[in-house]
C-alpha cells in the first residue's frame, strides 16, 4: 500500500562555500540563487534543484519517523555486494544506498528513490527519524548547474503486510523501477575466467565451447559462451602496463588472431558468443589529456569525444558477432574506489569530470545509455559488472550483483556469491536479471560445494554461468551439472531464501513447495580464508 511521504522537517544544502541548514521551506528559496523544490503526487515526491553559479555538493532531507523496537533493517549497496548485506538492528551510522526496508512482525516499511536518479543517494535511519543524502557533486567537486533545473531524485514509500519480507521487497523493487529491460530469453552458459584466468587461445576457447555444448545437449535454449579477459591486444604483450586488463580493444592478440572468425565458429558449434570488455581503460593510446580522468587515467565519458571512442569499441565487438557484452570496471575506473570503500561518499574530494555541469550520477547514466544505444541495433545482451545497478536499470539487461567468486577459494564463493544472490534476488526481474557470478570448477573446490552453488543459482531462475576446467569432472559429475544446466536453460524456477533474516549466508530456500537445505559450511573443506598457504590433504581414514 502507498505511504504518504510528508514534506521533510529539515533541509541541509552543502555547497563549496559552506553548509546551510534549517526547516523545510515550502517556497524552496534558500538564498544564494539556490531553489530546492518538491512536487508531490499520489505515489511519489520529486525533488528538484536549481542553482546559479554556486557549486552545489549535497542535498539533505530529514524526516521525523519512529520505528518499532523489534524492527530489522536492510539497505542496498553502491555497486556489487561484498558479502556484507544483511538485515540488522537499528544503526544510526549505517549508510544504506538507494533504499532501505524496515521489517517488523506486522509489516514491511520501504523507503527509496526511483531508479535512474541524478544524484548518488543514501539513507540513514535512527531512533528519531530518517535522513536522505543526495550527492549532486561532479566527481569530488560541486556541480555547476548555471541555472539548470536538476531533477535530483524521486522518493517513494510503501508498506506491505500479509506477505513475506522477500515478497514485499520484490514488490517494492518493482515500484522503484518503471522501465526495466530484460533478456529476450534465458541467459546461461559458460565463461572461461574462473579456470583460465586470462590464459587461453582461439582453439582453447573453441574446445571450451564444444564441452559446454555437449553438457547442454537437448536444452531448448542454446547457451552463451563468454570469452573473458585475455583476448585484447596487450593481454599477450610483455610491454603492457603491469596491472593489465586494459585496451585498446580494436583487435585480439596473437592467441586470438581473428575475433570475428572466433565468434562465427562459436555460433556454428551451437552456442551464442559473448565477450568481456573494460571500456574505460586504455593506458597506451595517445588520447588528449582532456579525455582522461585525473585520478584514474581512465576515459572520461562526460567528454563527448571520449564517449564516442568508448562506444566505438562496443560497436566493434558487436559487429564481430558477439551477442552478449559484459562490460566491466565501470565504477572503479570512474571513481577509483570499490563499493566497500565508498563509506559513504562515492567520490573522493579534489577532482571533477570534464563537464562540470553534470552530476556524477548523470555521467554514469550517460555512459550506460550510450552503451545500450550502441548495442541495441545488434540485439546484443548487456551485462553490467562493477556497475551501479540503481543507475543502470533500464540500460543493461543483466547486472552482476556481487563481487567475484573464485575457482580456487570456496570461502570467497560462499561469502560473495551466496550473500549477493540472497539479498539482491528481490532485484531480479524487477530492475534487470541478477547475475550472482559464475561457478568456478577447477578441482580446487570440492564438487559437492560447487554443485550446491550451481543448483541454487539455477533454481532461482537467475543467469547461471559455469567456468570449467574440462579435465576436472568425472562422468557422474558431468551428468549432475548437465541436469542443473537444463534447469538454468529454462529459468522457470523461482527459489528464494527463507532464513535470510537471521543468516547472511542463507541455507534454507523455498522452490515452489520444496524446502531446500544447503550445506555451505562442510567439514570436507575449510570454511575460512587460509591465513597462510598450505596444501589441503585428506587425512588417513578421513
Predicted regions and their residues:
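Aromatic- and carboxylate-enriched substrate-binding clefts and catalytic-loop regions
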Residues: 88, 99, 221-443, 449, ...
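Carbohydrate-recognition beta-sandwich/jelly-roll modules
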Residues: 1-224, 324
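Active-site-proximal substrate-binding groove within the catalytic cores of carbohydrate-active enzymes
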Residues: 135-137, 146-153, 191, 357-542
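Generic detection of long, well-ordered alpha-helical segments
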Residues: 162, 198-206, 253-256, 361, ...
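Hydrophobic, Leu/Ile/Phe/Ala-enriched alpha-helical segments that form helix-helix packing faces
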Residues: 49-53, 99-107, 209-216, 263-267, ...
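Residues that flank catalytic or metal-binding motifs in active/ligand-binding sites
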Residues: 186, 245, 455
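Short, well-ordered loop/turn elements at secondary-structure boundaries
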Residues: 43, 184, 221, 268-270, ...
